[in-house]
Amino acid sequence: MIKHLVIWRLKDEAAGNDRATNSRLIKEKLKALRGQIPGLVKLEVGIEGDSNNPEQGHVVLYSVFESRVALQAYSSHPAHKVVAAFIKEVASERRVIDYEVFAAESPSRAPR
């Protein structure tokens, strides 16, 4: 399993909307990808209130894929590309991390 996390900070205004509206639109557009992309096991989207803290993101994506191949297929999927183009227009920053989780790993064995 591959976990894919992305955090965005958004522009105050973009695409004719304020930041709060664009946050909601991103959430809706990402959630609409559920069931469209093979290998996408889980997708959650969170939006932050109205923080001006420069260290805090505005939108976070947490997703799980069956494999790296599935993650690559997601990246090139036409439905994802449409959402990504919108996000690129309204985001000012993006941070991403992808990491592999093995079945043998469990919360009780997590490093401290």
PLM feature segments, named:
Residues R68-I97:
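C-terminal structural segments of small proteins and small subunits
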Residues M1-G57, E66-A73, Y99-R112:
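Short S/T/G/P-rich N-terminal loop/turn motif that feeds into the first structured element of a domain
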